[in-house]
């Protein structure tokens, strides 16, 4: 307890630090994408992209249907050409917690002949699976922003 620590070590806990720092937090990230198809073929490709994320965030049933497995996780990266982007933040492994779709982002209902929408807006919400610690920055050069 606090009194014991004060007597044995001469140290006092700073109550302001406790108020400020309640523990490590998991970071959340949100990304919005406008996906516009110029043809029905591109529209089908967009549908596959949307399904990839919606299905990837869904829990997986075990073969016996008695248990659920965790959904897929995602490794996010910003790229500058083919290289990692040093001026933007890095991410730890993330879970996709939300996938919101807007089917009429411009306020107009427009489809191709097969019914596929001409434009979608997808907003993805990710949360890192572990907090960022001071020591995590050791893996980056001084010229990188890190996490």
What positions do the PLM features span?
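Acidic, Ser/Thr- and Gly-enriched intrinsically disordered low-complexity segments
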Residues: 1-147
């Amino acid at each position: 307890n606090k009194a014991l620590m004060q007597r044995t070590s001469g140290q006092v806990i700073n109550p302001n630090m406790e108020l400020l720092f309640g523990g490590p937090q998991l970071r959340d990230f949100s990304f919005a994408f406008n996906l516009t198809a110029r043809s029905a073929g591109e529209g089908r490709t967009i549908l596959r992209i949307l399904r990839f994320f919606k299905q990837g965030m869904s829990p997986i049933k075990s073969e016996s249907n008695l248990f659920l497995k965790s959904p897929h996780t995602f490794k996010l990266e910003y790229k500058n050409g083919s290289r990692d982007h040093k001026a933007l933040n890095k991410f730890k492994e993330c879970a996709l917690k939300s996938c919101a779709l807007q089917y009429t982002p411009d306020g107009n209902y427009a489809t191709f002949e097969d019914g596929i929408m001409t434009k979608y807006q997808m907003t993805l919400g990710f949360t890192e699976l572990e907090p960022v610690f001071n020591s995590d920055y050791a893996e980056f050069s001084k010229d990188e922003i890190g996490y």
